[in-house]
Design a protein with these regions (language model features):
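Short beta-strand segments enriched in small/hydrophobic residues
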Residues: 29-39
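Glycine-rich phosphate/diphosphate-binding loop of Rossmann-like nucleotide-binding domains
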Residues: 37-51, 133-231, 235, 240, ...
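Short beta-strand elements in bilobed, periplasmic/extracellular small-molecule ligand-binding domains
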Residues: 54-68, 191-193
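Short, well-structured alpha-helical segments in soluble
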Residues: 74-86
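Rossmann-fold NAD(P)-binding glycine/threonine-rich loop
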Residues: 106-124, 236-291
Length: 318
């Protein structure tokens, strides 16, 4: 079987269109403030990409660069300053933070209404109750892609009875694995979460109608791990060296093998990451509305996008 590509661009484009319209409705230009306290090149690149994404939809972006050896107090002071600044709609703390700094304490310090990364305990608690208003962006991206795949998802328990989709999430991080599982549980999926302690990964993954992989290990999931016809959502973004000494980006799923078995599969790049960026923009709009800006209600990302992958195309393997 050759799988259909479940591409992120059609979903992301629709979200960006909605965000542009929302910016016009709000009555003031939202602003994202990013805090960078590292010289990590990946974090610097991510900050630049955030700025570019904001610019595309009319959201202001400002980068607050702190020293790579900034102290806990230095970063907490900056967070407090941005919390109190009414011109700042949204705050994101880029990782990693300096050695010896308590990242979780910093996440707790961000005003929950400005926490567009969805890492403050208040917003994580919202995920437990099924809210996507300021849920972690990648978890929202996973849900959007699963919805776009057309697998059965439900909001009504009577309709869901005995019909829930079998989902396996590989990885239990606080910003991807756990919240993805919770959001899918809220759609009456039967969710199994696997992690480093799982004794027989294959025994679990081959039962999955939807397989979500988010561990940061290139090629961990192979064709043998996948149920024929399953939907595979590959969250991993890993840079690996090629035989010619260069590098390329790959996921956590061994793509060529998986595409022969799966029914639908997200590409890397071009899948989850693309939608995650759009969800950050969506969260900025939600933050603006939570802070009392014009236009009530959270922005709805495009759910139920059809019974097949939007813009999906078959993967022809040689």
């Amino acid at each position: 079987m050759s799988a259909t590509l479940l591409e992120g661009a059609p979903i992301a484009d629709k979200i960006k269109e909605d965000v542009k319209a929302a910016v016009a409705e709000i009555g003031r230009v939202p602003k994202l403030a990013a805090i960078l306290a590292t010289d990590n090149k990946g974090a610097e690149f991510y900050a630049k990409s955030q700025g570019k994404a904001c610019e595309e939809v009319g959201i202001e972006f400002e980068l607050h660069q702190l020293a790579a050896d900034a102290s806990q107090a230095d970063i907490e002071t900056k967070i407090a300053e941005l919390n109190d600044n009414v011109a700042v709609t949204a705050i994101i703390l880029l990782m990693p933070v300096p050695a010896g700094v308590d990242g979780r304490a910093l996440q707790r310090a961000i005003d929950p209404k400005k926490d567009v990364d969805g890492v403050n305990p208040v917003n994580i608690g919202g995920v437990v109750q099924g809210s996507t208003t300021l849920a972690p962006c990648t978890a929202q991206a996973v849900l959007a892609l699963v919805e776009a795949s057309g697998v059965p998802l439900f909001t009504d328990p009577k309709e869901a009875q005995g019909k829930g989709t079998e989902v396996v999430v590989v990885g239990h991080s606080e910003i991807v694995g756990k919240p993805s599982g919770l959001l899918l549980l809220d759609k009456f999926c039967t969710v199994t979460v696997c992690h480093i302690g799982t004794q027989d990964l294959k025994a679990h993954t081959t039962k999955a109608d939807v397989l979500v992989v988010a561990v940061g290990v290139p090629g961990l999931v192979k064709g043998e791990h996948i149920k024929p016809g399953a939907t595979v959502v590959d969250v991993g973004i890993n840079r690996v060296k090629t035989d010619d000494g260069k590098s390329r980006i790959v996921g956590d799923v061994l793509f060529d093998e998986a595409a022969e078995i799966a029914g639908q599969i997200t590409p890397v790049p071009g899948g989850v990451g693309t939608v995650t960026t759009a969800m950050l923009l969506k969260n900025i709009i939600d933050a603006a509305r939570l802070q009392g800006h014009r236009s009530p209600g959270p922005l709805k990302f495009p759910g139920n996008l059809g019974q097949s992958a939007p813009g999906g195309r078959r993967v022809k393997l040689q």
